[in-house]
Amino acid sequence: MFHSLNVEDYESNPYYKNIKIKDAEIGRWNLKNEIFKPYEAFVFNDLKKMNDGRIIPQIGFFTSEFKFPAVLEDNREWMLVTPNEVETMKKAIDKASGKILTYGLGLGYYAYMISEKEDVTSVTIVEKDKNVIALFEKYILPQFNNRDKIRIINEDAFIYAENYVQKENYNFIYTDIWHDTYDGIDMYLKMKEYESLSPDSKYMYWIEDTMLCYIE
């Protein structure tokens, strides 16, 4: 399923409008802007499961150049803010309220978008890589309007989930620590096991609908 996308629809997104990315490097990590060329195809949104059982990939393209921020690890794209991230996080942004925990920092897209919500009181981010945190704190976090809501914890997500999450009474917990379904399914299933430690929290997971297409 192909989608012809409008550049202006995404450039008007608050993150794209307000967060300006400059090239930077810390350790093995590089912060930079990448480009989709006109008519270059890319993954756009979760897999779509049809009524007849078919599973259809959703592919997007722009008719003009589109610039997006990225973090590369050893020159491999690892963390991006493309239309795919924008679309696949919409539901988790809409559902977030109160005291939020998110596993995985990336470029701070999810943290930024929910920090802009009046009904979100705090955003705790658990990230295991110190260099990713350093890039974010130096170049991105200072641009947040509500950075006073943000708390970053340098820890492995699974260690935090097993040992600390039950002490905090989070209202909403969002997990985004995988690159795609290839590395994500096992981590998704493992993280689901920890839900019982904070039973009053609402849980959501990045690209969960896509992963369920492979699991079910």
Model-assigned labels for residue ranges:
Residues 1-27, 84-95, 99-216:
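The AdoMet/dcAdoMet-binding core of the Class I SAM-like
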